[in-house]
Design a protein with these regions (language model features):
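Post-signal/leader-peptide non-cytosolic segments of secretory proteins
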Residues: 6-90
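C-terminal segment of classical bacterial N-terminal signal peptides
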Residues: 1-5
Length: 90
């Protein structure tokens, strides 16, 4: 019998993708991270998890700034870490 496949949670997958975007600025990575952030923040809204939603909106702003070559470096990574902690139940 085969072992069940282990999949990362949507939040963990988003965190990894967003971190790569913020560190390297590849347009395709950032675009996909924005799409995933939007889905997560809508999910947070639907669950009335407004603090989490607010944190995700901040990360979305950081991702857009990165796309515009105006990234905030370590501050953006810190925002991403805060969102990951604040949205842990998502």
């Amino acid at each position: 019998m085969a072992a069940p496949a282990v999949r990362a949670s949507p939040l963990a997958a988003f965190q990894a993708l967003a971190k790569r975007c913020l560190e390297h600025g590849h347009p395709q990575l950032c675009e996909q991270a924005l799409i995933e952030a939007e889905a997560l923040q809508r999910q947070a809204s639907a669950r009335s998890a407004y603090p989490c939603q607010t944190l995700l909106l901040g990360v979305q702003a950081d991702l857009v700034m990165q796309q515009l070559q105006a990234g905030r470096g370590a501050l953006a990574i810190s925002d991403l870490q805060a969102a990951t902690r604040g949205c842990s139940g998502l």
